[in-house]
A protein has these predicted regions:
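Catalytic core of pol beta-like nucleotidyltransferases
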Residues: 1-45, 54-59, 69-129
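Glycine-rich beta-strand-to-loop/alpha-helix junction loops that act as flexible
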Residues: 49-51
Length: 129
């Protein structure tokens, strides 16, 4: 087993399909996107936050994801790479609007210590991977 394989996360399907959480309503449609994210981009952690995690989503709600991963180029370029890889899924599956926050582990730890927004994500969000 390589180091990358050892670090690779698997999806938390129980959390994704938990009927007490709003995300369960879109779980089957969201799963292909999350599988690509986990399999191809090796995040250390993926946390769903916002209305699909702990709110009251409607047809205009986006899917908010905090992705903790080693940054390959920049957070922006990594987000573009993820979205480009998701493009074929959007053509044949359900179209989602995603809000991606991507940060390296060190930055994430610092933000948890210093910001209420990130603490709320960590405490109330749904850990998907």
């Amino acid at each position: 087993m390589t180091v990358l394989e050892a670090q690779r996360k698997s999806l938390n399907l129980a959390a994704l399909r938990d009927p007490s959480r709003p995300v369960s309503r879109i779980a089957d449609d969201l799963l292909p996107y999350l599988q690509v994210l986990v399999d191809e981009f090796a995040p250390r952690q993926v946390i769903l936050f916002g209305s699909y995690a702990y709110g009251n989503p409607d047809e205009h709600s986006d899917v908010d994801l905090l992705i903790v991963k080693d940054i390959i180029q920049s957070a922006y370029e990594d987000a573009v790479a993820i979205r480009m890889r998701w493009a074929p899924l959007m053509k044949r599956g359900r179209l989602f609007s995603f809000d991606l926050l991507i940060e390296p582990p060190e930055e994430h730890e610092a933000r948890l210590r210093g910001g209420a927004f990130y603490r709320e994500i960590n405490e109330r969000g749904v850990s998907l991977a």
